[in-house]
UniProtKB/Swiss-Prot annotation:
Residues 50-196 are annotated as: Dimerization. Keywords: Membrane, Mitochondrion, Mitochondrion outer membrane, Nucleotide-binding, Phosphoprotein, Transmembrane, Transmembrane helix. GO terms for cellular component: mitochondrial outer membrane; mitochondrion. GO terms for biological process: mitochondrion organization; positive regulation of mitochondrial fission; positive regulation of mitochondrial fusion; positive regulation of protein targeting to membrane. Residues 91-108 have a biased composition (Polar residues). It is a single-pass membrane protein. It comes from Danio rerio. It is found in: Mitochondrion outer membrane. It comes from the Eukaryota. ADP binds at S188, S190, H202, S344, R346, K372. The gene is mief1. Homodimer. This is Mitochondrial dynamics protein MID51. Mitochondrial outer membrane protein which regulates mitochondrial fission/fusion dynamics. Promotes the recruitment and association of the fission mediator dynamin-related protein 1 (DNM1L) to the mitochondrial surface independently of the mitochondrial fission FIS1 and MFF proteins. Regulates DNM1L GTPase activity and DNM1L oligomerization. One of its GO terms (molecular function) is nucleotide binding.
Amino acid sequence: MAGVNGDRKGKKDDNGLGTAIDFVLSNAKLVLGVGGAAMLGIATLAVKRMYDRALSAPSSPTKADPSGRRSWEEPSWLGSSPRTLNHDMKQNVSRSLQTLPTSSSSFKPDSLHRGLARGGRPAKAELQRARLRLSLQEHLWAFFHERVTIPSEEQSVARRAALDICAELRVFLHAKLPDMPLREMYLSGSLYDDLQVVTADHAQLMVPLILEKNLWSSIPGEDTIMNIPGFSLVRRENLEYFPRGSSYWDRCMVGGYLSPKSVLEVFEKLVAGSINWPAIGSVLDYVIRPVVPSETLTLEVQYETDRRLYVDFLPLLVMEDGVSLIAKPHRLAAERHENLWRQSFRVAETAKLRALDQEDAGCRSVCLKILKAVCKLNPALARLNASQLTNAILLLSEQEGDWTQEALADRFMQLLRALVGHLEAGRMPCTLNLKVNLLCELTPQEIDELGYTLYCALSDPESLLRTV
């Protein structure tokens, strides 16, 4: 505010702009609360800065700050590439986040009433905010119905294609390797949880391995020298009594541990190398081919001219303590940690989300599907996965109780702010295991790019919904 008042003293011919700005800012705190006033102040000062430049010397370049640095009125990220987030911007983001309202209560009518009781005028800004909130609400629901929701017919056809692939693999594996200790394979993923968005294009084929309880045990990643929560080692036990070869899966053991990479290689030789997919595809009227390269074993199934389904083949271990481990490597350290199995929280996270929605008829699942669609349709946000988005909602649910359908716009904005905060901190805890950092497989540059994109969207959230 001082910056505004100081500039005002030296400008007598600004046609009352300074007076108007001073009046708006002096009353903003009463009407909008501390957070709203801070954001209004930043925006107003930026506008006034441009206005002052236009009045001063339009033909001359803007003078640089004597210190060689831009002032906070000119954020260092203005005009920079959207793919680069420098240190100055991080500081701006951190400072701005601290001034953002922490809850929607800052914008509720009672805040306006308190302002009126202190002598403030009925705020046009409050009415405009309500209109904007209503507009965002309408856009979110329109986006949900028009872009997010998948027609039931498309989902049904995709599920049938996935089931056909599952049946072929089951028959082949039982015929080729009848002694391989496997439980019944099954299909899983968002296609079967009604959480898939935009197109029905992905499914997971879970392949549960049977391990002898007295021969194998899991060691949490945080208890190893690697110290990676969310992953586990599966160690071979009792080798002195049951030597190598006593378990079918000893052939996939590396350094005394069951290697998910070796397990995947066994299945890859069978699924990608031994099965005659062109012949099977001609019978099923599909075009089937293995995806190469891929971090997991994936099949691409073209079941219609313009529709493709990707089926991930995921070996699964269900340990004695109930922990589910899948053969999906660490994204950034697959070579260094090739013996690590990934702990899967998807089933428990989805169940928790649905239980919360059932308790209060909430819109958490709707929020999740909208965010998933936004990330799927915006390449700059593609690195945010379903687990991160689900946990952002679960974490916010611990602080915010109103998840009614009418609060969709407010919760959506809170989620954007929460995601920016997690990215700025470089950490998002998993609600089912607080030791797990769900951002640990993102590079610093990716975190910066995601944070930049979401931070820019805070001032224009509808831009996230304007996709091709």
